[in-house]
Amino acid sequence: MERNVTLDFVRGVAILGILLLNISAFGLPKAAYLNPAWYGAITPRDAWTWAFLDLIGQVKFLTLFALLFGAGLQMLLPRGRRWIQSRLTLLVLLGFIHGLLFWDGDILLAYGLVGLICWRLVRDAPSVKSLFNTGVMLYLVGLGVLLLLGLISDSQTSRAWTPDASAILYEKYWKLHGGVEAISNRADGVGNSLLALGAQYGWQLAGMMLIGAALMRSGWLKGQFSLRHYRRTGFVLVAIGVTINLPAIALQWQLDWAYRWCAFLLQMPRELSAPFQAIGYASLFYGFWPQLSRFKLVLAIACVGRMALTNYLLQTLICTTLFYHLGLFMHFDRLELLAFVIPVWLANILFSVIWLRYFRQGPVEWLWRQLTLRAAGPAISKTSR
């Protein structure tokens, strides 16, 4: 099958974009990921950095990646049930190992588990319309659960939202020293992530996967629509997303990031805007692809997308080495941490370009495929039930 270079580029953008938000999760305590006032006070530049990243990136790149993951499920259907289930089960295992032994911000476990459910929904959907509508419904269910959690939550702040000094020191201790203590805390994090996945986030993740599968089945993610359609759709969707999200960002600032409002209720506009912006970003890339494809950097980012799993794990390897093993954790604020993003991006891009000069797949992708072959046997041409 001939590769869709535009799709690879969009996937590469998603992987690189995720690091814009993850860098604060590597370099700061967990509470800082959503709460810029996690330590009780906040500088103007920290607030503006948070606001900018929240507007353009928070949730958007993860949503874009979920969309493409769903598109991948649609593309895998001809390989058959055993192949798909083996592939996703191996991803679950890899995500569990990654989350337990390396980093507490893993997304692979969640994607693998939800994918094991969603691929059947994709297979059994009778039409593009039903697949898309089911995805929208599941996503809205997730938003409804988030609203319910906000309504029943206590107005008093949580230690997870604004940790005290002892909690921050303890997190710094186990992240820098590693060992059994770190594994124990990461195991707790995996458990909490699974609870959140089952209760709320899994609905949204499943919804975006089904929407991505619908867009692939319709030909939209294959680039089969006009450039004018992609451009108009992209500008409109991004504008809608920004319009939804911007007032919520301003309101969180006005409320001084109060727990009940900002941890739950005002997350909803961000979550609602994310699909609009994510699909809008993808649409603009497709719409301007004739111009974008002239640049060598764009084709290099497409190489990152071809090795998405390898590059996601490479980001973990580089950032955990810098912030945990070399002791840079909590040495930089949110804006300063962005200075680390570009060197990591360059590492992703250079490694991908050089590797793909000699090999067809990334190293982790190759291993994943070989293990899938051993577990499932050769892929078959018709999806078995």
Swiss-Prot record:
Question: What keywords appear on the UniProt entry?
Answer: Cell membrane, Membrane, Transmembrane, Transmembrane helix, Transport
* CC annotations in GO: plasma membrane
The residue ranges crossing the membrane are: 12-32, 50-70, 90-110, 132-152, 195-215, 233-253, 272-292, 312-332, 335-355
Q: Where in the cell is it found?
A: Cell membrane
Q: Name one Pfam family in it.
A: DUF418
Keyword flag RNA-binding: no
Q: What is its main location?
A: membrane
Q: What InterPro entries does its record include?
A: Bact_Transport_Assoc, DUF418
- Look up and give the membrane topology term: Multi-pass membrane protein
Q: Does the keyword Transmembrane helix apply?
A: yes
**What task does this protein carry out?**
Involved in transport.
The entry's family comment says: To B.subtilis YxaH and YrkO.
Q: What's the name of the protein? A: Uncharacterized protein YeiB
